Amino acid sequence: MLACAGPAFPQVKATVTGVPDLPYKAVPGFFKPPPGEYMGETQGVATNSKGDVFIFFRGERSRLWQFDKTGKFIREIGKGFYGFSFAHSVRVDRQDNIWAVDEGSNTVAKFSPDGSRLLMVIGYRPPVTAGVVATTRGPNPPDTNYTLCRPSDVAWDMQGNIFVADGYCNNRVVKYDKNGRFLAKVGGAAVGSGVNQFNLPHGLQVDRQGNVYVADRGNARYVVLDNDLKWKTSYNNYGSAWSACVSEGAHQYLFVSNSNPNGNPPGSWDTTGQVYKLELDGTPVGKFGQAGKIEPDWQVVHMMDCRNPNELIIGEIESWRAQKFVLQAK
């Protein structure tokens, strides 16, 4: 298994003010793993149209678990799969296909809704030598259309086009058609903070109009691109940009996490860690939650699922768990 940490970034506090608190409650102990089994670093969380929850986490190997809508364990998907090396994200598309983004194998894998068939692989897993993935920390190779380097997330538009955050090395977003053929890209291996530049695009979502939302983690901003990957705007005042999530439904919302970064001193836990609910234009609706090690707090929100904007699933990289939260009416 590839053992590599992400780049270290300084803590960035949210600067937005006057955002109301949203009433919420946690659902303690919602997920029920198999007896004697535990989650590791919980990298990805996703739901399908039936309410089943998928959790992609790091243990002695990358593992993808499926739970039903009550939190009961159903199955493990992809056990022993060649593309599972160092989990990073899982998403479910509108046809309920399951997509696993693996940072270690440099791949994005598409599985059938029941997880029984592998339907597509984007990227290329380097050869394995002595049980270790032989990858590099730089571009792999630089600026190619089909080779990824430590990808971080995946999303789709209404036409089925595929968007990949090619995150840790290549600092870009790549667009493919529904069959995996290259269409466009923005960004590049060189880190930057200007227009059409990224410093670790870590999270990725697409709304019903085809706009692309990028959690540009190293730049502590959320970048909005049009469907052709042309720059539109950025939201810069919501702190550390780890995760972005766009809800379903006629009125969509953008949820972003001001996550508490790895190694952040405990003294700052009371000022970081909120999840913000935004209109798609960046206008804040409210915020909830706080950083901490004990439920219902969280320690480094890595990914979120918000298919239902009133029920969020949150995956934590440092507390090795996933939690369910319900937003309540005031």
Functional labels for PLM-detected ranges:
Residues 9-330:
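Eukaryotic scaffold repeat domains enriched in small/polar residues
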